[in-house]
Amino acid sequence: MTVIASLVVGSNGATSLNGRSSGLSTPADRARFLQRHRSAAAFIIGKKSAAIESYAASQVPIFIFTRSTQQLSLTHPLMQQVTVDRNLAEITQLIDLRITGDIVVEAGASLLQALIEVGGINILELSISPIAGDGDFINLEELLSKFEIESESEIDGTRLLECRYQRNSANS
């Protein structure tokens, strides 16, 4: 199956505004995000996303990646804590073997970048918003150097890119 990550980045490279990515989202980004979200066979999220985002309506497994061994308070019966104590690619592959369909990563910048570094993301759906954020900055050029842009469009000032991971990129 395919591991697909969604990421919205502000005009200044921030991935959050007031601690959340939703502040950077535009109608075009939100429509694409919801379409991908609703088609997921499973989710990989981080501990912070689990705490602030609502997955109440989800009917698929939700894997929460954390480095902590302390038991998290799980707010949904399909949430499973995954302690990241070994290679992220290996953990993601083990989850991939259990799931039929696409696994959608809805994580913050640090977890997403770690997954990209180990080749754990096949497709990146990147939205570049005209809104400036205030936290969790990334280097967009460095991020995109690991992917081939397969499609790009612009809707009302939001650039929507679909990118495929390059297994043989110079930086991997």
Regions found by a protein language model. Name each.
Residues 1-172:
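Enzymes that bind and transform nitrogen-containing heteroaromatic metabolites
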